[in-house]
């Protein structure tokens, strides 16, 4: 009998019942809640005269709608948009009513759901983790089975702590070799998406492995798993190892004492067996990956910074040619334009992909002693949580950013999506460390270019895209 993949093991450990139609009832260990996808779920509970079945499995925080400017210290009343204010207020009321732990808007622990749960130790290896947000795949970095769910499923989890799901296929993305200086986890995952496309992982749980992945910090692994959804995979995974254990140890929700020892022992099996069989295998050489920049309106429209935007006339596939033509028109680019000739109006460093302390350090390293270009209208840095913000300020990163001309903000989803005051105007180009570059994602008519934090900082000081390796002392240009 063939060995089991990590996904197989996690699935089997949580399978309550296999149903006649081939689906299974899966037990959920951790449920993360935010203000946008939960109001209807809580209302559904009330209408059915139900209560959350396991209160301590839930953790909540507002993130999508919250303002990131200092005015928000005034509380919910500082939220100008009435719908956004109502959603945040409703989350507070629902969590208060049912006794669910919530890090409210001005709690230092508040932040983006996919940042606060790991930093609290609420995401643990071997867990099943769900949230009403597609980037819940982030938590797979811990060797956890994590994915996004819809509002009706949020209600199901609150009421029963279970979900009905069908098992996916297994995909292995193996990245071997050493990353060059200036190349990051964000560049790895963008390169993967560029290689397999946004549908490449459809129907699969995507495990990332290989020496380059093992060398990544937990924050780098979270970045990669975060964007597995952009590669078409609902689930991203990295095997549990010593790096995982070291990150989790001592965090508020992590096991303590003898329970910690037992947990660490049990986590040793959270790896794919050597003889496990994957349905699909993709391989990349880390040493050949360069800093990446998305040029179009899909994450798969991505190139190395030293390349040129494609020419639709050179594409023989008529469907692909049309897609390139539409993307060029929306993005205001011309065929064969050098990536480094793309000028930026705004720069956004933040989001659940890249707003953790290591991301901010990488950006600050580039910003230090430099100034945001006069042609850049705005460059903002938005920490992923209040705790990340406090850590960055202890390290003096805020001063580096402010002296360089960046804005230093309060935590939240911010400019990743146009659901709060941070957004692009039509026609503006933005170097963004977020995860999606769809039309209108950052504001109607806004043009998003996905990059790493270091690349975003480099773009801010240059006013256009530049190979960050040119700014890193001792590395090849």
From Swiss-Prot:
Disulfide bonds: none annotated. It is an enzyme of class 4 (lyase). InterPro entries: 3-IsopropMal_deHydase_lsu, Acnase/IPM_dHydase_lsu_aba_1/3, Acoase/IPM_deHydtase_lsu_aba, Aconitase_4Fe-4S_BS, Aconitase_4Fe-4S_dom, IPM_dehydratase_rel_enz, IPMI_cat. The keyword Lipid biosynthesis does not apply. Its cofactor is [4Fe-4S] cluster. Binds 1 [4Fe-4S] cluster per subunit. Pathway: Amino-acid biosynthesis; L-leucine biosynthesis; L-leucine from 3-methyl-2-oxobutanoate: step 2/4. One of its GO terms (molecular function) is 3-isopropylmalate dehydratase activity. The keyword Iron applies. [4Fe-4S] cluster binds at residues 352, 413, 416. GO terms for biological process: L-leucine biosynthetic process. Its EC number is 4.2.1.33. It catalyses: (2R,3S)-3-isopropylmalate = (2S)-2-isopropylmalate. It comes from the Bacteria. Keywords: 4Fe-4S, Amino-acid biosynthesis, Branched-chain amino acid biosynthesis, Iron, Iron-sulfur, Leucine biosynthesis, Lyase, Metal-binding. Heterodimer of LeuC and LeuD. Catalyzes the isomerization between 2-isopropylmalate and 3-isopropylmalate, via the formation of 2-isopropylmaleate. Belongs to the aconitase/IPM isomerase family. LeuC type 1 subfamily. This is 3-isopropylmalate dehydratase large subunit. It comes from Pseudomonas putida (strain ATCC 47054 / DSM 6125 / CFBP 8728 / NCIMB 11950 / KT2440). The lineage of its organism: Bacteria, Pseudomonadati, Pseudomonadota, Gammaproteobacteria, Pseudomonadales. The gene is leuC.
């Amino acid at each position: 009998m063939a060995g089991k993949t990590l996904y197989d093991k996690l699935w089997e450990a949580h399978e309550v019942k296999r149903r006649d139609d081939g689906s299974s009832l899966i037990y959920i260990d951790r449920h993360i809640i935010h203000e946008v996808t939960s109001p209807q779920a809580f209302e559904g509970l009330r209408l059915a005269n139900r209560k959350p079945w396991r209160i301590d499995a839930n953790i909540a925080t507002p993130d999508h709608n919250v303002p990131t400017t200092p005015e928000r210290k005034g509380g919910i009343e500082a939220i100008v948009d009435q719908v956004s204010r109502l959603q945040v207020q409703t989350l507070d009321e629902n969590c208060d009513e049912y006794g669910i732990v919530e890090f409210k808007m001005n709690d230092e622990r508040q932040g983006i759901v996919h940042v606060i749960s790991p930093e609290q130790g609420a995401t643990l290896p071997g867990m099943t983790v769900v949230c009403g947000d597609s980037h819940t795949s982030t938590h797979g970095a811990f060797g956890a089975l994590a994915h996004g769910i819809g509002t009706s499923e949020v209600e199901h989890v609150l009421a029963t702590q279970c979900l009905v799901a069908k098992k996916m296929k297994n995909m292995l993305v193996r990245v071997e070799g050493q990353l060059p200086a200036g190349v990051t986890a964000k560049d790895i995952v963008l390169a993967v998406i560029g290689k397999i496309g946004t549908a490449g992982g459809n129907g699969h749980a995507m495990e990332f492995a290989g020496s380059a992945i093992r060398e990544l910090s937990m924050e780098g692994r979270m970045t990669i798993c975060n964007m597995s959804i952009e590669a078409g995979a609902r689930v991203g995974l990295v095997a549990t190892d010593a790096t995982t254990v070291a990150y989790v140890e001592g965090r508020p929700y992590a096991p303590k004492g003898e329970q910690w020892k037992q947990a660490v022992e049990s986590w040793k099996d959270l790896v794919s067996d050597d003889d496990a069989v994957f349905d699909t295998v993709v391989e990349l050489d880390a040493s050949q990956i360069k800093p990446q920049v998305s040029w179009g309106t899909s994450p798969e429209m991505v190139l190395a910074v030293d390349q040129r935007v494609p020419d639709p006339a050179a594409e023989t596939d008529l469907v692909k040619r049309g897609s390139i033509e539409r993307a060029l028109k929306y993005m205001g680019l011309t065929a064969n334009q050098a990536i480094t000739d793309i000028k930026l109006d705004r720069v956004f460093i933040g989001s659940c992909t890249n707003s953790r302390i290591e991301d901010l350090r990488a950006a600050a390293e580039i910003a230090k002693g430099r100034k945001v270009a006069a042609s850049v209208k705005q460059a903002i840095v938005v920490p992923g949580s209040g705790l990340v913000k406090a850590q960055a300020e202890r390290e003096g990163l805020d001063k580096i950013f402010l002296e360089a001309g960046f804005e230093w903000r309060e935590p939240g989803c911010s400019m990743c999506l146009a659901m709060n005051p941070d957004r692009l105007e039509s026609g503006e180009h933005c170097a963004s460390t977020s995860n999606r570059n769809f039309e209108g994602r950052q504001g109607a008519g806004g043009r998003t270019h996905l990059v790493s934090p270091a690349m975003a900082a480099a773009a801010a000081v240059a006013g256009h895209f530049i190979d960050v390796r040119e700014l890193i002392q001792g590395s090849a240009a």
